[in-house]
Design a protein with these regions (language model features):
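Conserved PLP-anchoring active-site segment centered on the Schiff-base-forming lysine
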Residues: 60-76
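Conserved active-site segment immediately N-terminal to the catalytic lysine
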Residues: 164-176
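Conserved C-terminal alpha-helix-loop-beta "cap" of PLP-dependent enzymes
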Residues: 77, 266-308
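Active-site C-terminal subdomain of aminotransferase-like
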Residues: 176-263
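Active-site-proximal loop->helix
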Residues: 77-88, 95
């Protein structure tokens, strides 16, 4: 993947490069088992947070609200994005170390059903490793006729995701995460039918408007604004390797590494922050030792200097 960054110079408006970008977008939909007629991947130049901005700013109609199932930093980031755009929020708040109570989620949505258009929840809270129940929350959203959006930035490409089985209308990620490319390109995968409806929604942003980017790509086969050329080359290679290894084998490889780390953490007498059944296994959060001799910076520097 790193070698794929070294490529011949090319104008980002060349048809040859547009074809590469189209193939990357199609492959991203395949990763989450979406059908091309139903789902589309829309690419943006930027970090993963740009997709939070895109989703919140583009998918909520004027005078409607977003309900955020909020138990961590990344859900809170979506809440802040909504506040910046003046979008009404129903903040369904839970403790950062606890999974959302589905009964409370449904009760809250039912109470606010007339006002809410979109239900939003992160799949994995990266700070804790907590894995949220997207399938169940998505089912609740659909029961009340709402669009369900999940920030799958830190899981997509490693944890198996199926947009149909997991009740996902929209999900998102960025190039450097689960697909294992390099930083600089993020993407929102969503239902074409709903994106088409957003044409008449409030236009809250110029650069991060989903309809603008989607419709330009649909017509011209390329991104509206300058794409991160080298990063898309790295995505092309990373996706090739993803499909060659296979979803199941890749997931099992990551879980084997996770088990090894957990075993060594336990051997050091350290304690994991969360019960394993609450996590994906991709993030292993450790309780900060109470020993006064523990120095995080020294531990960090030692690991860094030894390439760990």
């Amino acid at each position: 993947v790193k070698l794929s960054l070294i490529n011949e110079d090319i104008c980002h408006r060349e048809g040859e490069f547009a074809e590469i970008t189209r193939k990357v977008a199609d492959d991203l939909v395949k990763i989450v088992h979406g059908k091309k007629n139903d789902y589309v991947a829309t690419l943006f130049a930027g970090s993963g947070s740009i997709c939070i901005d895109v989703a919140i700013g583009s998918l909520v109609p004027k005078d409607k609200k977003v309900m955020i199932v909020n138990n961590g930093f990344y859900n809170d980031r979506a809440l802040q994005a909504a506040q910046y755009y003046g979008i009404g929020v129903v903040d369904c708040k839970f403790d950062v170390l606890e999974l959302p109570d589905l009964a409370i989620v449904e009760e809250t949505l039912k109470k606010n059903a007339d006002d809410v258009a979109v239900v939003y929840m992160a799949h994995q809270e990266t700070g804790t490793g907590l894995c949220n129940p997207i399938r169940e929350v998505g089912a609740i959203a659909h029961k009340y006729g709402k669009i369900f959006v999940s920030d799958t930035t830190s899981t997509l490409g490693i944890v198996p995701i199926n947009v149909y089985d997991d009740n996902l209308d929209f999900c998102m990620a960025s190039s450097q995460k689960g697909i294992n490319a390099f930083t600089g390109c993020s993407f929102l995968i969503g239902k074409k039918e709903y994106i088409e409806k957003t044409k008449d929604f409030a236009k809250r942003s110029y650069y991060t408007n989903l309809w603008r980017q989607y419709s330009y790509f649909k017509e011209h086969g390329e991104m509206n604004f300058t794409p991160p050329v080298q990063i898309i080359y790295s995505m092309q290679q990373a996706l090739k390797e993803h499909f060659e290894e296979g979803e199941k084998a890749k997931y099992e490889r990551f879980m084997a590494i996770s088990e090894l780390i957990r075993a060594e953490v336990a051997a050091l007498g350290l304690e994991e922050l969360l019960p394993r059944e609450k996590t994906t296994g991709l993030v292993i959060a450790i309780k900060y030792p109470e020993d006064e001799n523990f120095d995080f910076k020294k531990v960090h520097d030692y690991l860094y200097e030894n390439g760990i």
